[in-house]
Amino acid sequence: MPRGLELLIAQTILQGFDAQYGRFLEVTSGAQQRFEQADWHAVQQAMKSRIHLYDHHVGLVVEQLRCITDGKSTDADFLLRVKEHYTRLLPDYPRFEIAESFFNSVYCRLFDHRSLTPERLFIFSSQPERRFRTIPRPLAKDFFPDHGWETLLMRILSDLPLRLPWQNKSRDIRYIIAHLTETLGEDALPCCHVQVANELFYRNKAAWLVGKLTTPDGTLPFLLPIHRTDEGELFVDTCLTTTAEASIVFGFARSYFMVYAPLPAALVEWLREILPGKTTAELYMAIGCQKHAKTESYREYLCYLAESDEKFIEAPGIRGMVMLVFTLPGFDRVFKIIKDKFAPQKEMSAAHVRACYQLVKEHDRVGRMADTQEFENFVLDKRQIDPALMALLRQEAPEKITDLGEHIVIRHLYIERRMVPLNIWLEQVEGQQLRDAIEEYGNAIRQLAAANIFPGDMLFKNFGVTRHGRVVFYDYDEICYMTEVNFRDIPPARYPEDELASEPWYSVSPGDVFPEEFRHWLCADPRIGPLFEEMHADLFRADYWRALQTRIKEGHVEDVYAYRRRQRFSVRYGAISSTANSS
């Protein structure tokens, strides 16, 4: 190879990342206009297109590098020099951490995910941890109640870049003050102040004002979801001030925020204080840097592995017919492999399953579908694998595994947040906890359906319970769009004997779903059946599902709230707008 080619390759990769992140910011910057114009379908399209940008630009760089090297092979020393040159470009680079992930992605694409070693990749960052640089402009602005909280909040809302009129700004300010007074106490409020992020966080049909509320007892989140009425007027829907509420808003089962972040590392550090339970990976995920979040997730896994002597075991719960799932007993994530062969009733291919997982990645997850990270050639030390799991891997997925002696390489897997399987949770709880779980399950089904997602297999085992008690769907092999399903009523029996027959007396075509049948497996437990009939009986009616389909086909996009309906100002203090009810 000619001298100096290593530097040219390093510069080409970094320039490719610059182009990718520039487009990322460009798509993100359109969020305000999409919100103001209520162009909700454009919101959904922008979300999908932004996700695809990263892989698209990796592909462009790979093609450039193949032209530069003229297809000639590169030896190990050459690759090390490329990484050394790239590392030297990063100390003064503002998005160094994601640039390292982009380098990794280009390398993996070029070399088909082989020879993934720390010498060739940025397995860990080359830069000091949480590197602080001089920030060209502050990320947030401070507001103090020198002239009272009403004046403070009026300044905050008036400073927003939104160009729509307010429905009733004074009313919203009264509601915010009422909430803060109830939460903090009237005496504490004058001693508090607020720091507000300069950029709004857009998602679905809301623009979120994200801030920090400094009190005598510490710092709390200060979150205001701003919505628009059908008439184009702004209103604040609620005020959230607990870390648990903020954690749900920034949760792993929600779509990524659109927030303009030219310095993502600085924004992540700023958010960390109000989201103490979130890992670095989760914070990057929340602001839409999902590929770097994957890097951080892998680093968190390696750090856990280095400090633990646990062995990988099969994950608790009913064994899946499509996926083999394993975990580390104390780790908060699970590893999912597509089996080589599925149970006979699962008439699908591995390619179909991967397409379903990609659909979830790109779709609005409405807080009810867990996000995943996809890995290839994932290496495990055999000494850390329980013998029972090793036997299961060899039995269920031998074609996905390469034996390297002391290690195995898993050709493809997903990593996903670990939850308590809902069927296990329901066995362990009684009373109000049981009622809450059934209410949450039904709400999850409704919200998925409203977002044009039909889970397919609605058994409790395919859902999990998060640490906040939310029910989240995580088994995607039968997922499809609501508009692809034919919801039917079961025809009346022709004769009494029909209902006793082993085969149905009516024809069933692919895509047919009979909601009346849900009752058989959802209400079999006598503790659960009455609760389900009380709260969610309409899920057993085909006309309920067909009505949702009609709304979807007419182009209606449902409102999605990251908090309970009872927390909305319209419920707590009075009517606000004519927008749809919270689900």
UniProtKB/Swiss-Prot annotation:
Location, primary (coarse class)? cytoplasm
The answer on whether this UniProt entry bears the keyword Aminoacyl-tRNA synthetase reads: no
- Catalytic activity annotated for this protein? L-seryl-[isocitrate dehydrogenase] + ATP = O-phospho-L-seryl-[isocitrate dehydrogenase] + ADP + H(+)
Q: What is its EC number?
A: 2.7.11.5, 3.1.3.-
Q: Which GO terms describe its biological process?
A: glucose metabolic process; glyoxylate cycle; tricarboxylic acid cycle
Keywords in alphabetical order:
ATP-binding, Cytoplasm, Glyoxylate bypass, Hydrolase, Kinase, Nucleotide-binding, Protein phosphatase, Serine/threonine-protein kinase, Transferase, Tricarboxylic acid cycle
CC per GO annotation: cytoplasm
InterPro entries named in the record: AceK_kinase (IPR046855), AceK_regulatory (IPR046854), Isocitrate_DH_AceK (IPR010452)
Q: Where does ATP bind?
A: A315, P316, G317, I318, R319, G320, M321, K336
Question: GO molecular function: any one?
Answer: [isocitrate dehydrogenase (NADP+)] kinase activity
Show the active-site residues. D371
Query: Pfam families from the entry?
Result: AceK_kinase (PF06315), AceK_regulatory (PF20423)
**In which compartments does the protein localize?**
Cytoplasm
NCBIfam families hit by this protein: PRK02946.1 (NF002804)
Q: What is the protein's known function?
A: Bifunctional enzyme which can phosphorylate or dephosphorylate isocitrate dehydrogenase (IDH) on a specific serine residue. This is a regulatory mechanism which enables bacteria to bypass the Krebs cycle via the glyoxylate shunt in response to the source of carbon. When bacteria are grown on glucose, IDH is fully active and unphosphorylated, but when grown on acetate or ethanol, the activity of IDH declines drastically concomitant with its phosphorylation.
Q: Which family does it belong to?
A: Belongs to the AceK family.
Instruction: Provide the protein name.
Output: Isocitrate dehydrogenase kinase/phosphatase
Name the source organism. Salmonella dublin (strain CT_02021853)
Gene from which the chain derives: aceK
